[in-house]
């Protein structure tokens, strides 16, 4: 089985005095799939009245502890959290929201799944699967000849496919081991393998494997396998929080994920779901009243879904690369890791909005070179080296060439502060030292002359280092660098985080160095941290 790693963003810490408003907090809750409700007796629900929010947090296993489900009351005033109490009214020092699931790492064969344990499965789900798909699941040995005949007659009588003849075990074998060809040979292989599977595993293991394996839809290029991921894909919340009408819809989709796709074919989906509810009532899995109430509910699927298998593809690309650097490939593809990342979802969304606005402004300008402009964003925390947001191109949610990591361009005047840092570190210069902003010439090994110029084509004579840097004077920078030495400037690039020092060409001094945005971010993160280098990390 392809075990899907779960990749999470940063969790939101909750504590008194935190800079957090009720609006932003409820925004975070909605992002995580929490439902607004008059009562908060179930995990995953909240209620807001003015500056007070009652929330029932979900159970979640963090890297350092298992946080149980708990009810909290939060009060907000003036943009800060003023109180944090539990259901008994006692003060709570700190709590954490369950983090946002942002994607998967290393799913093979284009398949995604969230593996769920039996404890994470609502008891209704296996009972519903047995009632609709395999009524004799607890008795048969892998195949059920009578079920095949019964399904045939039932479907003929109804004029539509209402029942299937394959057992759940056969469906599991078909999904995991075999292809979708409809031949007698394949059906025979399916039956034999189902019998073998039943002989080697107990019913609970087979049911749990089925719940984690069965195909339930398509998310762009990724196949959605298992009820755990399907719950997030269709409803935006964990499987354990689904209600009767939602469980029934997922069971309905089993028969034909494309045909009963609730986003593309809502009428078909609701008809099939209501059929499932009638079957559950007939089998006394639920009462008639419960089935009728559930049948009156809307489908409840989320309005849209991010395509491509992830929420933040550029950031996840960085996560993948760092994991490949630090772990063995077989551990990443087989272990089913839980990966906690440094991504701040709110900051990421603000970065996306800012980039979109700036590109739109540039597109609206009359400058020809602005048309079709691309852009990237890399946001870091200087003290920790954490990458908190990343956008790899104009279309932030699309997979493809990650310009934040792979687009190498001349960095221009971004190189100049490194020249001045190299000079100051010699001890021979201070910010008030005088440097000449005068024409400079240097003969290159090929016989050509290197003759830089200022942007305005003018020279300014003697200026202080502070003035030369703030005005970004090319001539002053070149003269200073030649006095300090190209080798010292190149070494400063490496000291600040570049893996290799750039070639010692004079043009390097004014930015003729091709670097990626993530490399520039590493250099300037070190500068912002007072010269202490914290390698950029996403995990």
Model-found features: residue ranges?
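Short small-residue beta-strand/loop micro-motif enriched in glycine and branched aliphatics
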Residues: 138, 259-261, 398-401, 503
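Extracellular glycan-interaction surfaces
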Residues: 421
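Beta-lactam-recognizing serine transpeptidase/beta-lactamase-like catalytic domain environment
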Residues: 170-171, 224, 240, 281-400, ...
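Alpha-helix N-cap/helix-initiation motif
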Residues: 118, 161, 220, 262-266, ...
């Amino acid at each position: 089985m392809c075990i899907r790693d779960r990749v999470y963003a940063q969790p939101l810490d909750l504590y008194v005095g935190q800079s957090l408003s009720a609006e932003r907090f409820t925004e975070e809750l909605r992002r995580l799939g929490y439902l607004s409700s008059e009562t908060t007796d179930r995990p995953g629900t909240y209620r807001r009245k003015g500056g007070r929010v009652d929330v029932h947090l979900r159970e979640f296993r963090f890297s350092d502890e298992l946080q149980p489900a708990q009810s909290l009351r939060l009060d907000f005033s003036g943009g800060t959290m003023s109180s944090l109490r539990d259901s008994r009214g006692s003060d709570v020092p700190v709590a954490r929201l369950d983090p946002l699931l942002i994607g998967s790492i290393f799913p093979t064969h284009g398949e995604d799944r969230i593996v769920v344990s039996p404890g994470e499965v609502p008891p209704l789900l296996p009972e519903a699967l047995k009632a609709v798909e395999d009524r004799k699941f607890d008795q048969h040995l892998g195949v059920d000849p009578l079920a095949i005949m019964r399904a045939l007659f039932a479907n003929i009588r109804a004029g539509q496919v209402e029942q299937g003849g394959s057992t759940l075990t056969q469906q599991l074998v078909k999904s995991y081991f075999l292809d979708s060809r409809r031949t007698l040979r394949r059906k025979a292989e399916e039956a034999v393998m189902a019998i073998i599977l039943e002989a080697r595993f107990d019913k609970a293991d087979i049911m749990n494997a089925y719940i984690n394996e069965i195909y339930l839809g398509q998310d762009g290029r990724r196949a959605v396998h298992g009820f755990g991921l399907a719950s997030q894909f269709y409803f935006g919340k964990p499987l354990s929080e689904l209600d009767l009408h939602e469980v029934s819809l997922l069971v309905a989709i089993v028969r034909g994920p494309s045909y009963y796709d609730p986003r593309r074919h809502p009428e078909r989906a609701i008809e099939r779901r209501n059929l499932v509810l009638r079957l559950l009532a007939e089998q006394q899995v639920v009462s008639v009243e419960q089935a009728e109430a559930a049948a009156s509910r809307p489908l409840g699927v989320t309005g849209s879904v991010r395509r491509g298998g992830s929420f933040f593809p550029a950031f996840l690309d960085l996560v993948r690369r760092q994991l490949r650097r630090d772990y063995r490939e077989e551990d990443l593809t087989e272990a089913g890791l839980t990966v906690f990342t440094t991504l701040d979802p709110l900051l990421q969304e603000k970065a996306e909005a800012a980039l979109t606005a700036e590109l739109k402004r540039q597109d609206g300008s009359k400058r020809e070179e602005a048309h079709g402009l691309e852009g990237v964003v890399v946001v870091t925390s200087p003290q920790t080296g954490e990458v908190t947001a990343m956008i790899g191109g104009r279309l932030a949610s699309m997979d493809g060439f990650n310009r934040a990591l792979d687009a190498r361009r001349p960095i221009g005047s971004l190189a100049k502060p490194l020249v001045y840092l190299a000079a100051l570190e010699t001890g021979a210069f201070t910010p008030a030292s005088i440097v000449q902003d005068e024409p400079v010439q240097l003969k290159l090994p090929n016989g050509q002359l290197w003759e830089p110029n200022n942007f305005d084509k003018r020279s300014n004579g003697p200026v202080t280092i502070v003035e030369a840097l703030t005005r970004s004077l090319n001539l002053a920078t070149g003269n200073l660098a030649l006095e300090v030495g190209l080798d010292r400037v190149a070494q400063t690039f490496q000291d600040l985080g570049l893996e290799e020092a750039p070639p010692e060409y004079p043009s390097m001094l004014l930015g003729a160095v091709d670097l990626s945005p993530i490399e520039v971010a590493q250099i300037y993160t070190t500068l912002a941290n007072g010269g202490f280098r914290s390698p950029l990390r996403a995990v």
